[in-house]
């Protein structure tokens, strides 16, 4: 009998599976926002897709997502 793989809980909280891959939030938007321009903060608002080169690593960290 094989041992079950463990999900890395930190990664499970950060990534969501979609039909096209994994979506993620953008970095640099949690604190020290006063020195960042409104344009920069606005552009950091949306969700992004995980790059293809990183997808295998995310899949290994979250095998059951």
Swiss-Prot record:
Any idea which UniProt keywords this protein has? Ribonucleoprotein, Ribosomal protein
Give the family this protein belongs to, as stated in its UniProt record: Belongs to the bacterial ribosomal protein bL35 family.
Transmembrane annotation, as ranges: none
Q: Name one GO cellular component term.
A: cytosolic large ribosomal subunit
Pfam families, sorted: Ribosomal_L35p
Name its GO BP terms in alphabetical order.
translation
Q: Which gene encodes it?
A: rpmI
What species is this protein from? Psychrobacter arcticus (strain DSM 17307 / VKM B-2377 / 273-4)
Q: Which GO terms describe its molecular function?
A: structural constituent of ribosome
Q: What is the lineage of its organism?
A: Bacteria, Pseudomonadati, Pseudomonadota, Gammaproteobacteria, Moraxellales
Question: In its UniProt entry, what is this protein called?
Answer: Large ribosomal subunit protein bL35
Domain of life of the source? Bacteria
InterPro entries xrefs: Ribosomal_bL35, Ribosomal_bL35-like, Ribosomal_bL35_CS, Ribosomal_bL35_sf
